[in-house]
Each structure stands twice: as structure tokens, then as C-alpha cells.
């Protein structure tokens, strides 16, 4: 059965944010992913986090993806990682996986993600 879609029939209740609120009040998301040549998934995931209302979004991706991320979403704080690194404090939610494959770089990112035990994580 096919029906016409009517936007007026949808009641979306988006809570109003206070005029004196700060983006840091609405959660900090870290997206880990995007190995060399597969940055699109991680870039789109970070963009989706923004559209869902996250206050601050960080993307840690392969260094070859940094320029594309910053061109598409300059509001996403993008860091190029090529070696082992530590996930910094202050993050509320971690998403690990978009754009990873079966290679050494992806395994290193995954190893860091599974050490997270004090944050909400989707791996």
C-alpha cells in the first residue's frame, strides 16, 4: 500500500534549549573509525551525531581522512591518528567501528576502544 507522506501529520517534540546554554552541556561524542580509504563511514557517523543533538563531536580517524572531514563538517573536531594513542578524558559516548576493516591500523583503534570501561560505548 502506498500513501502520501504528510509532514504536517508528524508531531516531533524537540526540547527547546536554554538561551544561555553551551554546546558542552549536550554531551561529548567520540567517533573512532575510518581506516585509509574508508573515511566516509566515520565522517557520516560524526555528522549524524551532530544532527542528533550532540554538543561536541570528536572524530579520530586515519590521517588521510582529516581534510575530507573538515571540509564536510568543520564543526567536528577531527584528529588524524596513525599509531597507538590514548583516548582523552571528557568524552561521554564512544562509537567505534564505522569504516574499519581487517588491518593493523583498525586493530589498533579497536584495541584502544575495548579498554574503555567508564564510558558508554558502541563497538
Please place each PLM-identified region on the residue numbering.
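Small-residue (G/A/S/T)-rich helix-start motifs and N-terminal tracts that mark the onset
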Residues: 1-123
Amino acid at each position: 500500500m502506498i500513501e502520501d507522506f504528510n509532514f504536517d501529520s508528524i508531531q516531533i517534540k524537540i526540547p527547546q534549549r536554554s538561551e544561555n546554554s553551551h554546546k558542552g552541556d549536550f554531551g561529548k561524542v567520540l567517533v573512532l573509525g575510518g581506516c585509509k580509504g574508508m573515511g566516509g563511514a566515520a565522517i557520516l557517523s560524526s555528522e549524524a551525531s551532530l544532527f542528533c543533538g550532540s554538543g561536541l563531536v570528536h572524530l579520530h580517524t586515519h590521517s588521510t581522512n582529516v581534510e575530507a572531514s573538515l571540509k564536510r563538517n568543520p564543526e567536528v573536531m577531527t584528529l588524524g591518528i596513525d599509531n597507538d594513542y590514548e583516548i582523552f578524558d571528557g568524552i561521554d559516548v564512544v562509537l567505534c567501528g564505522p569504516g574499519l576493516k581487517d588491518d593493523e591500523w583498525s586493530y589498533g583503534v579497536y584495541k584502544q576502544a575495548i579498554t574503555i570501561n567508564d564510558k558508554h560505548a558502541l563497538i
